[in-house]
Amino acid sequence: MSTSQLILELSLIGTMQLVTGVFLVRSYDKTDSVGTKVQKILTGLLGAFMVMAGTVKFFDPFTTMFAKQIALSELPFPTLSRWAGQLGEIFAGLLLLGVMIGNKALAAPIKDKAMQLSTLLTTAIMIVAVYVHLLPSVPAEVLPLQSKPPVMTLIILGLAWLNAFLYFRNE
């Protein structure tokens, strides 16, 4: 891994942590239940992660790895699949960050729809990712963390479902 790539990754991770941290501090409320606090933190972290995961796929080596994953998995409409994956991750993350940032300013039905849409997008993207991970034709070298078992993918999927559960339980 080159120095410029490492700097790019660290700057993206640091920026997302900073943005998430600032908005979590701003939305802190002493009267929130433990479930609500966990849900707010999870919303921010998932949102930041999804934006970052979609964004890094515009830069090498991630763009090359992502293109190889799609080509080797023989997903239909490879160009559309690539753009849908990248922009879907970014949009799902932005929806989650919007819910976290606009918690008090947004009307409840808008927040509810944003949470539902982000969970639906994340679920669809992660199911496709699990499929790609499990294909024998896709080597570990082109997968995130170069790991063949879809552990990270399933963790993100589980956290997205937990986040939605906590959000709608607190409503």
Residue ranges, per PLM feature:
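Membrane-interface extramembranous regions
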Residues: 2-171
